[in-house]
Amino acid sequence: LGQIWSEINPETKVTADLEFYIKPAYLEQVQKREVKSIEEVKFFEPCTGSGHILAYAFDVFYKIYEEQGYNPTEIPELIITKNLFGVDIDQRASQLASFVLLMKGRQRNRRFLRTVETKNIQPNISFYQDFEFDNKFKNATALGSLIRVDTLELKNLVVEKNSLFAERQEEVKKLYQLLGQRYDVVVTNPPYISSSRMEGSLKQYVEATYPETKSDLYATFILRCLELCNENGLTGYMTPFNWMFLSTLEELRKIIIKKHLINNLIQLHNSGFDGATVFICTFTLRNKNINDAKGSYIRLSDFNGPQNQAPKTLEAIKNKNCGWFYTSNQGSFEKISGNPIGYWATEKIIKMFSENKSLENFASLAKGMDSGKNDLFIRLWYECESHNSNYKLDNSSSTFNNDKWIPYRKGGEFRKWFGNNDYVINWKNNGELVKSFSNSNIRNERFYFQQCLSWTLLSSSFFGVRYYEKGGVFDANGSSLFYENEEGLLQILGLLSSKISIKALQIINPTLAFQKGNLDKITINKTTNSINKGCK
């Protein structure tokens, strides 16, 4: 909101009072906005909840009105009736948000509630209801602000005043108006619900209407807020930061990179909130792309604990050379396979991605099996008798005779180069018992018994890749890489254990999960036949 107003009125001093305001690095490239009154600036919260965001927006609007010389007794009414808009699926929450705004008005003007009563002032906050007579809002309590309303539908909407449904029609008209107009600023903390947890009608609607972001509801709201925003307006969010890296949300990243502009983004430490480990970022998007513009980024990944997040953010805003403040042209993200928002990547890293082929072009990477019940089929190697254990099999033929226990790679603790050979699996008769178990999932069997590299799926420390000789099978937690010969495999082991690959992997996916799809995208310069003999 402060940014929008500073573009309308460049002489404003309001942004100087906003301690977390980040002045865009590309400000000179922004097209001058049409001059308009502060009364015309519209702010929308599509998932209002109890009104925390609207309450903060009220304070910023108040500063602007004061600076413009408005009568202090008139400002609360103007903000509530002209500037702030919100809606929620929960009636109680929307009522509480309305109450919060009225109390904000009372805080600024002790006679405000008297004005509310005499003028019948109502905040522009509504709640979703299911309206059986209107197909668009039949499942409104499930779909909420994801419902799309176009201007033609809004124009053609008629309230039949003599109808028995006149009052209900007035209520649905409010929702059409809220979702049919466009706003200068749209800000929200959207619901976080993965597709597997969405209820039927919501899941069906999201898959049909927002296919690019169907994997998580918060990602769908990122797009929806941009739709609700004026061209060149700003949207603001607090969401998980996995949209920046997950392969399932690559299409969302492509849309943002091509059509919009990441204005600024703060990536919090995963311990940034008391009592919870959450991967959160807060960011703003401009509803317009500006060629060669650089967004501003603050990376708090190295600062543990909630007590560090705000101070380190303020330090970065004041001192751009602090080491955790970055500016980046989002066009460079397109040069990295998967389009991750790798804003801290150096020019050398970007060049490495753009000039070399990814690992998937040279090697096969595969996710392993799920036994379905490890306690039933898996043992530590020393728990089994040696006479029916075999660690050097080329194939499963001998398991039809005496061999029962064979090596089983299932990740394990952080270890580089070699190791974590702790487990064996009952593979008697080519895994007959495991394969017949109802909950098992046998994947990529063609790679079983081959020499390979493997790593642990989840790690709270560092990425470590290990070499394994032929003779075993592998687990989903021990995804593996296969190559045509041992020399090439060892060369790749050296590459993946290098600092440069670790840096590349952190850009592709800086979470605790190292998935097959992440390693696929690491680039390799395959112009030499030299072997990293140190890996032996």
Predicted regions mapped to residue ranges:
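Class I S-adenosyl-L-methionine
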Residues: 1-79, 93, 190, 245-252, 359-391, 405-408, 413-425, ...
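Active-site-adjacent bridging/hinge elements
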Residues: 16-37, 70-77, 157-164, 192-204, ...
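Class I S-adenosyl-L-methionine-dependent methyltransferase module
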Residues: 37-40, 44, 53-185
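Signature of N6-adenine DNA methyltransferases within the class I
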Residues: 55, 62, 89, 94, ...
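Sequence-specific dsDNA recognition surfaces
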Residues: 204-208, 416-444
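Short Ser/Thr-interspersed hydrophobic loop/turn segments at strand-loop and sheet-helix junctions
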Residues: 446-464, 473-475, 492-506
